[in-house]
Amino acid sequence: DVLFNTNVVSQVRFLGAWTSTGYTKIERTATWDYLQAFIDEGKKLGLKVFAAINTFPGGNTTSLGSEGVVFRDNTKRAWTTELNTSNGIKSIMDVQKNAKFFNPVRDDVREYIISMLEDLAKYKDLDGIVLDRGRFDGFESDFSTYTRAKFEQYIGEKVINFPNDIIPPGTEVGKLPNPLPKHFKKWLEFRAKVIHDFMVTARSRVKAINSNVQFGVYVGGWYSSYYDVGVNWASPKFITSSKYSWASSLYHNFGYAPHMD
């Protein structure tokens, strides 16, 4: 749910805030455009205004309850990621995780998110858009039949022992098996390509609407283990495999730094 004008998803209905009585649900009663108000006031003060968006989560659960499109719309619920847990492959909706991520591999998910970004770009005085959580949920994501088929298409062969030939259930980042599973490096490469290609398309679509708006991302600086969320935020000139044993020879091709302002 959002605080800007769009027909793609619903407006925020409540937010949590710490008050004198503790963490409290604050119902939204205002009908004015929150983002436009920030733009207007920011410009009066000579400030630049950037809009941040939680990219791939479709809902969130807190002590105040569950909110988000995946809790209201069964079609969108079906887009959520499936995790390679130690107890089998499970929907993120069925495990104890607060943020309910979509599967970034899905074409319908990508179009859904980009449509929202296009609406953000229509704010003519907005200085920039920053994507947070523009990534996979984590190392366990995504092991749906949809993603398996896309991966098999990418490598040109069937994965016979799934998911063990990719990542054995329960594998932790930084505690990789030796030797690495048959398709492990290509899997990391595939995921990095998924996020890279999303960013390239999203930037192009945003710039087509507003060429002046800046496009950027918020990422973690721990590059050596950031493969767990499928993100290569480096320059493609940095040959990842020369430094890290988990990277394929092509992993560096999907560094998306040149596509950020």
Where in the sequence are the language-model features?
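Catalytic domains of carbohydrate-active enzymes, especially glycoside hydrolases
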Residues: 1-2, 123-127, 260-261
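Aromatic-lined substrate-binding rim segments of carbohydrate-active enzymes
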Residues: 2-57, 186, 190-209
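Hydrophobic faces of well-ordered beta-strands that scaffold small-molecule active sites
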Residues: 49-51, 129-132, 215-217, 261
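Substrate-binding cleft/loops of secretory-pathway carbohydrate-active enzymes
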Residues: 58-66, 139, 199, 208-261
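Active-site neighborhood of glycoside hydrolase catalytic domains
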Residues: 115, 123, 128-131, 137, ...
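Active-site phosphate/pyrophosphate- and oxyanion-stabilizing loops and adjacent acidic/basic residues
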Residues: 118, 204, 254
